Amino acid sequence: MNLVLMGLPGAGKGTQAEKIVETYGIPHISTGDMFRAAIKEGTPLGLQAKEYMDRGDLVPDEVTIGIVRERLSKDDCQKGFLLDGFPRTVAQAEALENILAELNRSIDYVIHIQVDKDILMERLTGRRICKNCGATYHLVFNPPAKSGVCDKCGGELYQRADDNEETVANRLEVNIKQTQPLLEFYEKKGYLRHINGQQDIEKVFADIRELLGGLQ
């Protein structure tokens, strides 16, 4: 099974990726992991990517696509893969189609974990961290016993700057704009399947399992 996983920040993509990989025994391939592995192996493309990353620049598409091609050609991808964080653009999606055609493969499904923006805001702005011991809480899902105080050490809880409403709203807006053309591309291809990410974790995964039931 050849899968692409999509979802906005806070949609629970990471949790579902772990469950898919554990259940179906396919590799979880994220862009960051691919870059790190290529750099560690010292491949020509990995070294090129490192140069850009060391300068703080974006790695250009031709390098990223080359690394994806190398990764998908490895033995552990013969029975399938779960791509996460790639593609990010229609140009990358078209390049992925070409790579898979070279390998006589095709995408089975693009799984889009769908969550309303207001729920994503609640999930992403609710995090609180202890200034003293670093313990993490969530005002809705994992609140401290006493408001603003760490259960473990009594330290003060704070909200990280990038978890505030304005920053989170901007981050979501940027992601929505970037994601929309990609969703439309995969909708036209017939690969796209929406999964309701507003349910509890096990129900979300049950829906994914039902979708994947016919695939080997």
Swiss-Prot record:
GO terms for biological process: AMP salvage. Its EC number is 2.7.4.3. Zn(2+) binds at C130, C133, C150, C153. The keyword Cytoplasm applies. GO terms for molecular function: adenylate kinase activity; ATP binding; zinc ion binding. Keywords: ATP-binding, Cytoplasm, Kinase, Metal-binding, Nucleotide biosynthesis, Nucleotide-binding, Transferase, Zinc. Residues 126-163 are annotated as: LID. Pathway: Purine metabolism; AMP biosynthesis via salvage pathway; AMP from ADP: step 1/1. It catalyses: AMP + ATP = 2 ADP. GO terms for cellular component: cytoplasm. The keyword GTP-binding does not apply. AMP binds at T31, R36, D57, L58, V59, G85, F86, P87, R88, Q92, R160, R171. Monomer. PANTHER family: NUCLEOTIDE KINASE. Consists of three domains, a large central CORE domain and two small peripheral domains, NMPbind and LID, which undergo movements during catalysis. The LID domain closes over the site of phosphoryl transfer upon ATP binding. Assembling and dissambling the active center during each catalytic cycle provides an effective means to prevent ATP hydrolysis. Some bacteria have evolved a zinc-coordinating structure that stabilizes the LID domain. Catalyzes the reversible transfer of the terminal phosphate group between ATP and AMP. Plays an important role in cellular energy homeostasis and in adenine nucleotide metabolism. This is Adenylate kinase. It comes from Geobacillus sp. (strain WCH70). The gene is adk.
